[in-house]
């Protein structure tokens, strides 16, 4: 079985983004209405600006045109992951330890599908949060999404 479009795109664009001193945070390939969108989220220490996004858009467009992993027409969007960036890689969970996060699960876990708390980190294969001095270990296998959440 071959790689998914997302895996192919990530493999093609990651080196280009890394060469610019940026981090590839996430890639989405979604259909909205009649149009397909390839969304690439990038970041760096101190955040990205419009020039970073424009530069990456041009570079990624060139390399994707060369390798052509996507058959149909799509719109390319490059942006910052925003304040509520997704946490996907092990490094994300290490880097954002102590930050407020929101975790959504694919199924009900201990009576809930949504958890918010301060990230303790990854322990074995659980995402560990602390809220009001209680710790909750959520199995990563049932996590649908994990994001930083903005504190007011």
Swiss-Prot record:
The main place the protein resides is cytoplasm
Q: In the UniProt record, does the keyword Ribosomal protein occur?
A: no
User: Could you tell me the Gene Ontology terms of the biological process aspect for this record?
Assistant: ribosomal small subunit assembly; translation
User: According to its UniProt record, where is this protein located?
Assistant: Cytoplasm
Q: Does the keyword Flavoprotein apply?
A: no
Q: Which UniProt keywords apply?
A: Cytoplasm, Ribosome biogenesis
Q: Which InterPro entries match?
A: Ribosome_maturation_RimP (IPR003728), RimP_C (IPR028998), RimP_C_sf (IPR036847), RimP_N (IPR028989), RimP_N_sf (IPR035956)
Q: Which Pfam families match?
A: DUF150_C (PF17384), RimP_N (PF02576)
Give a GO cellular-component term.
cytosol
Question: What the protein does?
Answer: Required for maturation of 30S ribosomal subunits.
The text of the family note is:
Belongs to the RimP family.
Question: What is the official name of this protein in its record?
Answer: Ribosome maturation factor RimP
Q: Which organism is it from?
A: Desulfitobacterium hafniense (strain DSM 10664 / DCB-2)
Name of the gene encoding the protein in the UniProt record: rimP
